[in-house]
Design a protein with these regions (language model features):
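Ankyrin-repeat-protein effector appendages
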Residues: 2-21, 151, 183, 216, ...
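Ankyrin repeat boundary/linker residues
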Residues: 15, 55, 89-93, 126, ...
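Start-of-repeat signature of ankyrin repeats
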Residues: 18, 58, 92, 96, ...
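Ankyrin-repeat alpha-helix packing hotspot
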Residues: 24, 64, 102, 135, ...
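Ankyrin-repeat intra-repeat helix-capping/turn positions
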Residues: 29, 69, 107, 140, ...
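Conserved ankyrin/ankyrin-like repeat signature
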Residues: 33, 72-73, 110-111, 143-144, ...
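Ankyrin repeat domain, specifically the short helix-to-loop turn at the C-terminus of the second helix
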Residues: 38-49, 75-84, 113-121, 146-154, ...
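Helix-start (N-cap) detector for alpha-helical repeat units in TPR-like alpha-solenoids
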Residues: 318, 351-352, 385-386
Length: 399
């Protein structure tokens, strides 16, 4: 599952500092404790509003109270201390999210309504292009999602990184996804010219989201995307149950990839008899395959695969996959990007591709995978500064 928009972990040193104690009091909704700390911190050091300068990775006291849905604490911070409900958190955790956005993830409608009544900006986006509706949807907060839509937030609002429906699919939030669809979200919307909510749901293995999207009219073949669902699933592997579902839903197994290969051929390349067996009766026989059977298809495809792919085809495919990976990376969908970089590597090793996949794995918390790619990158380009940097970053994560 993709990372939810905001997941805050309490400071590791707990209450050893007044700043941490302040944030912990806000997170836990302890108003009395919070007031005591505010008085202690600001005694002789300026006005109480100075407490908003204390933060942890961009998360200040109002962000913390908002995320916890602690309404009384929020009222105190806004009305008595002058907290700004639209102040973006500048840091690696907040990523530009405002207290108003974070309040959506509390699931507490009264807190969200309070922030809205005090100037909360429904259209403002954080550093990842997510509005408050994106935050509510990604966290699976159904009541908040309904409330925001009732206030006129466009159901397909997109600030450059995809609409809320895309976020629901990548976070496996079938309940909020259904709410969006009930409010007429477009199930066939194209994100950055490369993917759709249905393809995203497949990549993240969310069968519930896929069923809802298809029921709402999503194109089961994703013809407007760079590849069909069956092509992706049979090429990638590990999606056998999803292939069975897609075929029952009417997916066409006769649509090839950009090199003219059908899903049955891609499954045969991986020697997956179960998938070939499912696809065989629904696929139009290939004239060049003399024995149209499970073993016959696998044998033919394996023999054909021994022949060298034309260099221009290999390069074209690699460019396509890299483009898809780059798009996913810009959307901060690192799992999707990592998989696409891996497919591109299968078409020819490249230091750049290994470096890019290394940083994806780093951001996903996979230190060993990141280091492995960084080392491979250094083998291909020993003196490349980026390769050395990737290796050092992976080592830091593993410490």
């Amino acid at each position: 599952m993709a990372a939810a928009p905001f997941v805050y972990c309490a400071p590791s040193d707990g209450g050893r500092t007044d700043e941490n104690a302040l944030l912990m009091a806000a997170l836990h909704g302890n108003l009395g404790r919070l007031k005591d700390i505010v008085n202690s911190l600001t005694r002789g050091n300026g006005g109480p509003s100075a407490i908003f300068s204390f933060n942890k990775d961009g998360v200040d006291v109002l962000h913390g109270a908002a995320c916890g849905g602690h309404l009384e604490v929020c009222k105190y911070l806004v009305e008595e201390l002058g907290g700004d409900v639209n102040a973006p958190g500048i840091g690696s955790v907040a990523l530009g999210a405002t207290p108003f956005m974070m309040s959506a993830q509390s699931g507490d409608v009264p807190t969200v309504k309070y922030f809205l009544d005090h100037g909360g900006d429904l259209m403002k986006a954080d550093d990842k292009g997510r509005t408050i509706l994106h935050h509510a949807v990604s966290a699976g907060c159904c009541k908040v999602t309904e409330f925001l839509l009732s206030k006129g937030v466009p159901v397909d609002i997109d600030c450059g990184r995809g609409p809320p429906l895309f976020m629901a699919a990548t976070n496996e939030q079938d309940k909020t996804l259904k709410i969006l669809l009930d409010h007429h979200a477009n199930p066939n919307i194209i994100i950055s010219g490369a993917t759709t909510p249905l393809l995203s749901a497949l990549i993240y293995r969310s069968l519930k989201c896929m069923k809802l999207l298809i029921k709402a009219g999503a194109d089961v073949n994703c013809k407007a995307s760079t590849m069909t669902l069956l092509v992706f699933a049979t090429m990638q592997g590990g999606y056998t149950n999803f292939i069975k579902f897609l075929l029952k839903a009417g997916a066409d197994p006769n649509i090839p990839d950009d090199l003219g290969r059908l899903p049955i051929e891609l499954a045969a390349l991986r020697d997956c008899k179960e998938e070939v067996e499912m696809l065989l009766p629904l696929t139009t026989p290939i004239p060049t395959v003399p024995n149209w059977s499970i073993e016959g298809v696998i044998s033919h495809v394996k023999n054909e695969d021994k022949k060298p792919m034309e260099q221009r085809h290999r390069e074209r495919r690699q460019r396509l996959l890299k483009s898809q990976a780059d798009t996913a990376f810009k959307l901060k969908e690192y799992k999707m990007a990592s998989e696409c970089y891996g497919l591109a590597i299968d078409h020819g090793e490249s230091a750049t591709l290994y470096a890019n996949r290394s940083v994806c794995k780093l951001l996903l918390g996979d230190g060993e995978g990141s280091l492995s790619d960084a080392l491979r990158c250094r083998m291909l380009r020993p003196d490349w500064a980026k390769a050395c940097y990737r290796q050092a970053a992976a080592h830091m994560l593993l410490k």
